């Protein structure tokens, strides 16, 4: 009798399982076609009838229920029903979700792995007659993976905290830079705004007098500090463009009386050059007189030769000085070009002045023999001094 009851219950349970399976699949397909949602409706249909026990007759005894639920055939039918549902979901995903191929492949792989595991468990049940289910004592989690996951989470949180702090610091620096720019552009207006801030705070929030008093005191301190800064800026001497240029080149924070140092340096160089070239001219005047007497050259021709030789010597000396000071070849060429341009420009000016002088003394320009040698030597000396002064001014400090 017991065997007959078990067979009847198993047959009724099989028929009820097949009916339930068809109903759930039909419900899943209808809800997917109506709503278009993939996960919520499937969960609803599965939650409505999670187990086939609700289909059984109400008159069954508890013994029949326990024996039916513990039988391996019932468990096999449950697995079969669940994997049929997975096949329906898989077909639906293959037809409708084409936007995420990676998720689709992962879902298909997980379904295939589950199918292989179920096949292995069915084989074990067929050999041993017992289902291979994990016991309560076995822990499926891996402690190494848990520790790695916790370390990964803490590392990500620390990185996000660092990013937040860096962004906050950048915003504070930008706000401070904007505040400094506004103070430098219009310090008086900024001081007025800081003076008016506590009054506006007192009027706006009369319910909190202590907080307003603290805000007004802090605002007054800031306004007094801003006033002191503006007064210090006013007391400082105004700097010129050349001083700003020197500050930028030398990378110095503060330089007092920076305009006096280049002037003293230039004056020293100019005095030394005057003395040196004065002696140079006196020596060459005797040489010009000797050449003009011995070889029959005119004084003007010998003076012109002297000037061109002097230009050559000056350019060679300048080139050696620049080579000692500046090792960069392009910088040397640039400074020599400035020096040569200054030399030829001043030389043209000197010849223009000589023509004006010839016009004033009523002599034609080509007749240089009527011009005394002393006057021509004076012009030559002035020429040399102006050239040296222009070269010093053009090349020093640049």
UniProtKB/Swiss-Prot annotation:
Keywords for the protein's UniProt record, in alphabetical order: Meiosis, Membrane, Transmembrane, Transmembrane helix
Keyword Cell cycle recorded:
no
Which residues fall in a compositionally biased region of kind Basic and acidic residues? 224-236
Q: Where is the composition biased (Polar residues)?
A: 119-135, 183-199, 248-260
Q: Does the keyword Membrane apply?
A: yes
Question: What does UniProt give as the signal peptide span?
Answer: none
GO CC annotation: what is one? membrane
Q: Which GO terms describe its biological process?
A: meiotic cell cycle
Which residue ranges traverse the bilayer?
Answer: 269-289, 305-325, 341-361, 373-393
Q: How does it sit in the membrane?
A: Multi-pass membrane protein
Q: Major place of localization?
A: membrane
Disulfide bond annotation, renumbered to this chain: none
| Stretches with biased composition (Low complexity) | 210-222
Q: Coiled coil located at which positions?
A: none
Q: Where in the cell is it found?
A: Membrane
- For the region Disordered, what residue ranges are annotated? 30-81, 119-260
- Report the function annotation for this chain: Has a role in meiosis.
Identify this protein by name.
Meiotically up-regulated gene 126 protein
Q: What is the source species?
A: Schizosaccharomyces pombe (strain 972 / ATCC 24843) (Fission yeast)
């Amino acid at each position: 009798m017991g065997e007959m009851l078990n067979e009847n219950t198993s047959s009724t349970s099989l028929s009820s399982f097949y009916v339930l399976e068809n109903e759930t699949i039909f419900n899943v397909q209808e809800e997917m076609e109506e709503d278009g949602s993939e996960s919520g409706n499937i969960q609803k249909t599965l939650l409505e009838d999670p187990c086939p026990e609700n289909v059984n007759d109400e008159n069954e005894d508890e013994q029949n229920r326990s024996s039916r639920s513990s039988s391996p055939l019932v468990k096999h039918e449950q697995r079969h029903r669940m994997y049929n549902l997975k096949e329906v979901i898989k077909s639906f995903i293959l037809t409708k979700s084409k936007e995420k191929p990676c998720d689709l492949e992962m879902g298909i792989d997980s379904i295939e792995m589950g199918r292989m595991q179920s096949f292995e468990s069915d084989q074990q049940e067929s050999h041993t007659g017992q289902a291979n289910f994990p016991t309560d004592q076995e822990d499926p989690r891996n402690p190494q993976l848990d520790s790695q996951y916790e370390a990964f989470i803490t590392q990500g949180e620390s990185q996000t905290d660092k990013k937040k702090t860096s962004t906050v610091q950048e915003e504070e620096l930008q706000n401070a830079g904007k505040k400094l720019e506004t103070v430098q552009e219009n310090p008086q207006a900024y001081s007025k705004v800081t003076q008016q801030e506590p009054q506006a705070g007192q009027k706006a929030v009369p319910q909190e007098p202590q907080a307003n008093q603290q805000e007004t005191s802090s605002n007054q301190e800031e306004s007094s500090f801003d006033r002191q800064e503006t007064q210090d800026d006013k007391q400082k001497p105004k700097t010129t463009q050349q001083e700003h240029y020197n500050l930028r080149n030398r990378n110095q924070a503060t330089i007092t009386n920076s305009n006096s140092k280049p002037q003293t340096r230039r004056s020293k160089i100019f005095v030394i050059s005057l003395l040196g070239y004065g002696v140079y001219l006196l020596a060459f005047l005797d040489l010009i007189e000797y050449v003009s007497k011995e070889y029959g050259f005119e004084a003007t021709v010998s003076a012109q030769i002297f000037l061109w030789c002097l230009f050559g010597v000056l350019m060679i000396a300048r080139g050696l000085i620049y080579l000692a000071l500046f090792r960069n070849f392009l910088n040397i060429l640039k400074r020599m070009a400035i020096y040569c341009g200054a030399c030829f420009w001043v030389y043209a000016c000197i010849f223009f002045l000589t023509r004006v002088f010839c016009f004033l003394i009523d002599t034609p320009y080509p007749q240089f023999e009527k011009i005394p040698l002393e006057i021509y030597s004076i012009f030559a000396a002035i020429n040399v001094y102006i050239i040296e002064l222009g070269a010093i001014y053009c090349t020093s400090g640049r």
